[in-house]
């Protein structure tokens, strides 16, 4: 399994936000940027990707604090979200005077904003006093908002009386070579790379690969020299109405998640209030977890009407999930 650390930034009844660290590839990721004062300053300085659900204050107030810690550091930070996130970021940045920036290391924010089936790409560069520069427009495909060779982030547009985004980050299963066996083969470095490419492509199943003076079948090499590194899927859902359409969209997005971070704002007895303010109840959160067949549920964004008594939410979730193997933490 990839080496991924992930955890909530705040208490369950405080601002939403999840931090995710993929140290071996140098990615430090935020999902939402509300109050982030509890996050270690050294980690905030490393953050290079931010996925924002929407820009209500409790999901966006921490941008200024992050900006303050980024100044003096040369870095590119990628930000993803739904319209009007680029406008919101622009106005945040223009709330300050940027003279003397010629003496500052270059900090750049690259914003990818979703709107009506398209992504709008913008650049904000401290050397240009964070002027809003439109870069390009691209067609959104396959519900993917970000992808690299290691993982991808899918999204869904959900209803919170405004459009908001839900996210799911997924590392696929990976074919790995058994190093101890590979070392025994008469193969040079580039030849090992060719072998891996050969085995990663299932279209080669009827072909053979030459090692030394002998040819081996695809199946034989696959069974003897490889193993599968299990991937991981981590999803983040908050600030959504518990409507049939939302629940269906969320279920598709977070299907088979290893970890589902999902709001659980109200007890079921307060379902009328939940509908009024477009949030989920414990019953709806549990329903999503069951329908999506998730392994672990991490609930958050508990209503402050229950004070610090988080057990009220946890106990009710446990009741709704008692007939499942889903772990609540």
Task: Indicate where each model-derived feature is located.
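Active-site-proximal loop/helix segment associated with metal-binding centers of metalloenzymes
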Residues: 121-236, 240-245, 252, 259
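Conserved beta-strand hairpin/beta-sheet module of binuclear metal-dependent hydrolase folds
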Residues: 1-45, 49, 76, 167-169, ...
């Amino acid at each position: 399994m990839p080496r991924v650390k992930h955890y909530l930034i705040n208490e369950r009844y405080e601002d939403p936000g999840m931090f995710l660290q993929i140290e071996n590839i140098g990615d430090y990721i935020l999902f939402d940027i509300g109050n982030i004062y509890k996050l270690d300053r050294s980690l905030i300085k490393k953050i290079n990707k931010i996925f924002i659900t929407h820009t209500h204050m409790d999901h966006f107030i921490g941008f200024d604090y992050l900006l303050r810690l980024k100044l003096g550091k040369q870095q590119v930070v990628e930000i993803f979200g739904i319209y009007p996130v680029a406008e919101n970021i622009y106005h945040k940045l223009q709330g300050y005077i940027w003279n003397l920036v010629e003496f500052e290391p270059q900090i750049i924010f690259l914003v990818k904003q979703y709107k009506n089936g398209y992504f709008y790409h913008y650049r904000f560069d401290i050397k240009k006093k964070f002027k809003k520069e439109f870069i390009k427009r691209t067609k959104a495909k396959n519900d993917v908002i970000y992808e690299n060779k290691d993982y991808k982030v899918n999204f869904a547009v959900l209803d919170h009386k405004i459009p908001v985004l839900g996210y799911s980050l997924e590392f696929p299963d990976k074919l790995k070579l058994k190093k101890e066996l590979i070392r025994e083969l008469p193969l040079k470095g580039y030849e090992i790379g060719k072998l891996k490419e050969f085995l990663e492509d299932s279209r080669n199943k009827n072909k053979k690969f030459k090692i030394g003076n002998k040819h081996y079948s695809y199946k034989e090499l696959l069974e003897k020299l490889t193993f599968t590194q299990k991937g991981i899927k981590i999803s983040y859902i908050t600030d959504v109405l518990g409507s049939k359409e939302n629940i269906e969209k969320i279920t598709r997005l977070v299907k088979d998640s290893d970890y589902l971070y999902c709001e659980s704002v109200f007890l079921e007895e307060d379902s009328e209030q939940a509908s009024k303010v477009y949030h989920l109840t414990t019953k709806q959160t549990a329903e999503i977890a069951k329908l999506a067949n998730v392994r672990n549920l991490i609930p958050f964004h508990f209503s402050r009407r229950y004070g610090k008594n988080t057990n009220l939410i946890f106990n009710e979730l446990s009741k709704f999930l008692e007939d499942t193997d889903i772990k609540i933490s």
